[in-house]
C-alpha cells in the first residue's frame, strides 16, 4: 500500500478520486493500492516555553533558547490555558495508522514552504523514516494530478525547502517569545506581543501615521496662462512653484502685460506603455484592494478557494512569469477566457496569433509560475469569488495583449521671459488597457485643455486668453492602505519608482507573498492597527508598543529583510541552516537585552473602588482585573470580543462605568462596528452604542 497525505480533506478527496481510492473511512479514503489521508492545516507545532520549564519568566531566564526544539500536537487557547486541539490529536492518530500500514508515502500537501513544513513536522513528530516522494503540481485539475502522479519527485529534493520553512518557524519562535517576554518583564505588563516580522510592519504603519499627523502644510503658488486659437485651447504652466507669495504675485503682474506669446517648441512622439506582468499573489492582493476594497487576507482566502475548485493555478506564488512549456497552453486558455461574459466585447477584436510574451521567462519562475486560470469553466461562484476570478482572468488577457500606444505632445512658450509648458497624451491604440477600460486610466491621459493632440505650430504667435495664479498647499504622504502597505513590505519601506530597482530589492522584503496577508491580519487581530475608511492607522495600543521599541533592532524593517533574504538562500542551497540559526540566536540575545534595558514609568498607584461590592479595590493584572475583597467575585477579562482592553480603557471603565468609543469591534457574527464597553446593572460587561445624531425623520 502507498500512503498519500494532502493538506486538507477537500484536496485529499480529489486526489483519491483520481487515483481510484473510493472506500471512505474515518479520516482517510482507501482503494486501488492507496490510502489517502490529510492534515487539517498545521497539526503539529513548536512547543511553547512552558514545555521547557519556562513558566514564570524572569530577566535571568532570557533569552530562552530551546536545544533541541520540541514538536507537539497543535495547541488551542481555552479558559484553562493552552491545551491540545482534540481534532488535531485525532487526525494525527489516523495519519499514524495510515503510515504504519503503508510501505511508502506520497506527499501531496501544498507545493510550497508551508505545505512542506506541515508534512515534515507530522513525519518527524510521528517518528517515521519511510521513504517519501513529492507530488508537486501548480493546479488541482484532474489532468494536473494525473500528470503529477506520473512524475513524482524524490522527497529529498525538497530538503532545502523544508530547512527554510523550519528555520523561519524557529526564528519566529525565538524572536517573538523572547522579545514579548522581555517587554513584559521590563514594563510589568504582558499586554503586548512582539514578532520578528509583525513589529517592523507595525513600525512602518506607526511612523507613517505620526509623519502624517505631525505634518505642517505650507502654501505655494502655481502660475499658468491659457492660450486659444480657433477651437483649440491649452493651459501652459510655469515649471517651478513659488514658495513666496510676494514673488508669485510680482510674477503674475509681470506676465499679465503680455497678450501674445510665441510657441518656441513643439514635440510630438509616439510612446508605448508595456502590458502588465501576470499576477503573483502580492500584485493580485494590491489590485483587489485598490479596485474592490478587498483585504489582503480576504483576497488570499478567495484565491485559495478558487485553486481548490480547480479554477486557477497555485495562488501563493512569488513569480509573475511563466515558462515556455506553460506558454504553449496559453492560447487555448485565452480562447476560453474571451468567451466569458466579462471579456466578450474585448474578445471580438483580440488576436490570438500574436501574443505578447513579456511574461514568459523561465529564469524568473520560482517554485511556482504566475497566477493563471486553468480553463475549467467557473460555475456557482460567490460574488467575491467572481470578482477575484475576473481579476486573474482579466490580467491574463492584459498580459498577453499588445502594448498601449499613445501620442504624447509637449509644447513650450515664453511669456515675459518666463517659461511655460503644456503636456498631454491621447491613446491611439489602447491595446491591453481596453480589457477593463478603467476610468482612472483614461483620466490620466486627458490633455490640459481640449483638441486632442492638435497643436499650435512652432514659431506661431498665439493670443493669451487668461492668466492664473493658484494657491495650493503641500500635502503629507497619505496613510497606508493595504495595497500601499503590501508595496512597502515588498520594498522594506523604501519608496522606489524604478521598476528594475524595485524587482532587485524584493529579495530583501518583509515576509513573503504567502505570509504578508497573515502578518497584516495578525496586527488587526492583536488590536495594534485598525481601518479608517480604506486607510490603516495604529490603535492606541499599537502606538504604545511602537514608542517602546522604535529605533531598536526588532523594529528595523531592513534588518528583517536581510533575514528573509537569508531564508531564500537556505532554500536555494547557498546558506547553511545552522549558520542562519546561529545568527538568529545571537540576534535574539541582542534584541532581548535591548528591550530589558528599557525604562518604563512606575505603574499608576491609583486604586479603583470595586463597582460591585463598593468595598474592595480592583487589582489590574496582565489578562484580568479583579476585586481583592474576599467573596466579591468581580472579574473583568481584558479580552472582550475581538478587542484587548488597554490600561486606559480599564481606567475609563472603572472611573465612569464606560470606555470611550472603540473602533472596529466585531460581534459574534463577524460584523464590525464602533462601540464602547460598559458595565450593565449587574456589573457585567456589555456593549454601549452612541446615540444617533438628530431626530427621527417623518
List PLM regions with ranges:
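Conserved short loop/turn motifs at secondary-structure junctions
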Residues: 1-3, 110-111, 188-191, 268-277, ...
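Basic, low-complexity terminal or inter-domain segments flanking catalytic cores
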Residues: 2, 88, 125, 180, ...
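Amphipathic alpha-helical transducer elements in NTP-driven molecular machines
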Residues: 9-16, 33-36, 40, 59-62, ...
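C-terminal or mid-to-C-terminal helical accessory/interaction module adjacent to the motor/catalytic core
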Residues: 87, 93, 100-101, 140-227, ...
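Accessory interaction regions appended to the cores of large information-processing enzymes
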Residues: 17-23, 38, 47-48, 54-56, ...
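Metal- or metallocofactor-binding catalytic centers and their adjacent structured scaffolds
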Residues: 243-279, 285
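Intrinsically disordered, low-complexity regulatory segments
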Residues: 1-169, 173-175, 350, 476
